[in-house]
Amino acid sequence: MSESSLPSWHGTTILCLRKDGRVVIAGDGQVSLGATVIKGNARKVRKVGGGSILVGFAGATADAFTLLERLEAKLEKHPGQLTRACVELAKDWRTDRYLRRLEAMMAVADKDVSLVLTGQGDVLEPEDGIIGIGSGGNYALAAARALIDIDGLDAETIARKAMAIAAGICVYTNGNMIVESL
């Protein structure tokens, strides 16, 4: 079987949002290979930097963990400077022959900033503080934007509702959520 005829990995929805001084990253637990669900309880959201930074990753698992390790190293080199650490990681990701082949995206956030990191060298800060990445990311993003201004809904409630909407639309997203907050 040639590499191009192998089924591709799918199965991540990551959502990051801010409301009322809180930041939340939520991720579903599904990993699929082609049309087959391989795992339903993967943990794609983590706290790093001594618990002061949230990370959610989408893409090939080994690639995502490689990038997570690299981000942690950059954070050790630039403590308390999430944006700088992300820019340094993006530079490496873009220029290093090994890293530029990695297929993953990351949503990262601390108490002050939320960022998307891509393999194209992008470090993006959304103007509304809401990020959606992965196969169901756009569904979760749209749902979160619709819910964000509703009084009485806190950041975690919005994240859970938006992720449930994404899980109801995207076949590569399940309702088994991990939610971390600061």
Curated annotation (Swiss-Prot):
A single Gene Ontology CC term: HslUV protease complex
Enzymatic reactions: ATP-dependent cleavage of peptide bonds with broad specificity
Record comment: activity regulation: Allosterically activated by HslU binding.
GO MF assignments: metal ion binding; threonine-type endopeptidase activity
Transmembrane segments: none
InterPro entries attached to this UniProt entry: ATP-dep_Prtase_HsIV_su, Ntn_hydrolases_N, Proteasome_sua/b, Proteasome_suB-type
Gene3D superfamilies given in the database record: Glutamine Phosphoribosylpyrophosphate, subunit 1, domain 1
Localization (cell): Cytoplasm
GO process terms (BP): proteolysis involved in protein catabolic process
EC number(s) recorded for this UniProt protein: 3.4.25.2
PROSITE patterns reported for this sequence: PROTEASOME_BETA_2
Chain residues that bind Na(+): 167, 170, 173
Pfam families, A to Z: Proteasome (PF00227)
CDD domains: protease_HslV
Alphabetical keyword list: Allosteric enzyme, Cytoplasm, Hydrolase, Metal-binding, Protease, Sodium, Threonine protease
Coiled coil: none
Subunit structure: A double ring-shaped homohexamer of HslV is capped on each side by a ring-shaped HslU homohexamer. The assembly of the HslU/HslV complex is dependent on binding of ATP.
Function: Protease subunit of a proteasome-like degradation complex believed to be a general protein degrading machinery.
Family: Belongs to the peptidase T1B family. HslV subfamily.
Stated name of the protein: ATP-dependent protease subunit HslV
Record organism: Paramagnetospirillum magneticum (strain ATCC 700264 / AMB-1)
Gene: hslV
